[in-house]
């Protein structure tokens, strides 16, 4: 119930108008429910900390929207959407999207539509005391807003990267209500909501109907969804922390000053993971374009070896998280491949063999009950010295006699071993060593350790790293600093053309790559 919703310490409500943007109804792992609720209710931190802005534009759809503003607006007028300088990859992506948008929505003289000068907003004023102490509720939409000359027809075109799963019913219902009842402009007779994918130009109709049908859709799906947004209580540390105005008062985000071994107080707040670090080391532009979520090439992203590795991880995660923890055995189902993965017969057979090898080193032999196991948990720490939110997702955290153990699992098709130092080969283990050595995972330090499990056709290797051994900690700290230092001071993310371009999943958007067409 809304009565039990409470803000954290350190915030002040500055408005009695509740404003909800339609995107909040989508939810998902990249949104924080508690932050959305605070934002809708008009809360601000009591002592806001000035933040430095990024030099480059980081809103992936912003330049596309700005280009559409120029295309549809009066000559010489600046676009409504303001953007910063563009990275080469974002410019290429945006130009690609505009070209496909014009092809998907050609001008129709028989049914002319014009862009409205101001997006619609639905306003509602409670007739009596409001449980959330609001004088007014507002729902807003974002996208390309078009209407017929007489205003009887409204259409909202929602730009997305690709057409994925359908958005939640509550999202579509809220948008339909704004189109049907929002101002400015006369009430329409019909409304339409359509998604447009910048990647391939495909469109998908989410709703089309009369004004009354739109209102009925909201009555069916909207109120519960709205309450879910307004009364969100879950703090969800993760990638959203990078731009969160409530980070300094968040009760769920743990701080880890000095974790990365660098210090700078004049840099934009950012997020970082070992995956980002690897991508940046290969090519700064590659990491930046991945962070922008530019579409990747399936021929690279879902290459069969990588796909087999992800399928094995998904199988083990489900097995380890299911019910009472029981050690895995050599009995592997013939149809072991989880839903969503497509492997050829020889890869399925190899995967089954590797899973049987896992039984000999399954960590569930050491746990007491389900509370001792965390499969792919989200480990998030704010390094306040660097102002970087560090993100990690170990394959498994398990408790051995009260001590937390960080387990990473890898696969190999050969029995050859590398001579390269372990913490350099697998930087996620370096992060694990530093976190455990600092006591950030809690628990009894006596048996706390990091483990690397490598599944091979001939058997399983299990490497154990003592995080409290001085040499291991020094090496781990050095590995992290080396991965982070240059990236932390970089504002341009210049491409670094070379052999890695051949296996770059975002090469299509990079004009510096000589293999961009092949990667597409």
Identify the role of each PLM range.
Residues 2-9, 14, 161-170, 176-263, ...:
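Metal-dependent nuclease catalytic regions and adjoining charged, substrate-binding loops involved
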Residues 171-176, 219, 349-355, 430:
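Well-ordered, non-membrane alpha-helical segments in soluble/globular domains
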Residues 178-182, 294-295, 315-322, 434-439:
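Active-site catalytic microenvironments for nucleophilic, acid-base chemistry
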Residues 254-256, 266, 274, 280-295, ...:
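Hydrophobic multi-pass inner-membrane translocation pores used for secretion
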């Amino acid at each position: 119930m809304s009565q039990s919703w409470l803000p954290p310490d350190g915030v002040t409500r500055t408005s009695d108008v509740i404003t909800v943007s339609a995107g909040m109804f989508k939810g998902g792992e990249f949104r924080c429910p508690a932050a959305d609720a605070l934002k809708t209710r008009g809360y601000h931190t009591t002592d806001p900390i000035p933040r430095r802005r990024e030099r480059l534009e980081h809103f992936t759809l912003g330049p596309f929207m700005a280009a559409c503003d120029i295309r549809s607006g009066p000559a010489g007028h600046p676009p409504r959407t303001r953007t910063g300088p563009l990275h080469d990859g974002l410019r290429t992506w945006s130009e690609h999207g505009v070209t496909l948008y014009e092809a998907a929505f050609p001008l129709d003289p028989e049914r002319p539509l014009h862009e409205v000068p101001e997006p619609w907003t639905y306003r509602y004023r409670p007739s009596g005391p409001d449980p959330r102490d609001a004088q007014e509720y507002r729902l807003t939409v974002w996208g390309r807003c078009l209407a017929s000359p007489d205003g009887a027809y409204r259409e909202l075109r929602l730009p997305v990267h690709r057409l994925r799963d359908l958005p939640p019913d509550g999202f579509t219902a809220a948008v339909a209500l704004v189109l049907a009842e929002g101002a400015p402009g006369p009430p329409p007779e019909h409304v339409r909501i359509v998604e447009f994918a910048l990647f391939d130009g495909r469109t998908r109709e989410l709703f089309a109907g009369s004004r009354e049908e739109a209102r009925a859709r909201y009555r069916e799906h909207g109120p519960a969804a709205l309450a879910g947004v307004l009364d969100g209580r879950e703090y969800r540390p993760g990638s959203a922390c990078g731009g969160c105005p409530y980070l300094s008062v968040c009760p769920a985000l743990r701080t880890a000053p000095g974790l990365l071994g660098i210090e700078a107080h004049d840099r934009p707040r950012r997020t970082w993971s070992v995956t980002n670090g690897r991508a940046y080391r290969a090519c700064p532009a590659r990491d930046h374009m991945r962070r922008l979520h530019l579409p990747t090439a399936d021929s690279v992203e879902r290459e069969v070896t990588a796909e087999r590795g992800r399928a094995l991880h998904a199988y083990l995660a489900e097995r380890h998280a299911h019910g009472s923890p029981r050690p895995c055995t050599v009995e592997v189902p013939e149809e072991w491949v989880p839903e969503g993965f497509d492997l050829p017969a020889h890869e399925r057979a190899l995967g089954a063999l590797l899973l049987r090898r896992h039984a000999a080193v399954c960590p569930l032999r050491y746990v007491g009950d389900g509370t001792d196991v965390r499969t792919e948990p989200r480990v998030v720490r704010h390094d306040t010295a660097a102002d970087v939110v560090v993100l990690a997702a170990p394959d498994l955290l398990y408790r051995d006699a009260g001590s937390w153990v960080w387990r990473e699992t890898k696969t190999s098709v050969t029995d050859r071993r590398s001579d390269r130092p372990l913490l350099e080969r697998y930087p996620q283990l370096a992060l694990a060593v530093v976190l455990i050595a600092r006591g950030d995972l809690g628990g009894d330090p006596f048996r706390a350790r990091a483990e690397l499990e490598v599944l091979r056709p001939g058997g399983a290797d299990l490497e154990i790293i003592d995080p409290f051994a001085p040499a291991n900690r020094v090496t781990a700290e050095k590995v992290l600093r080396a991965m982070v230092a240059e990236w932390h001071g970089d504002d341009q993310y210049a491409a670094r053309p070379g052999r890695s371009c051949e296996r770059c999943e975002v090469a299509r958007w990079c004009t510096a790559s000589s293999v961009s067409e092949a990667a597409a």
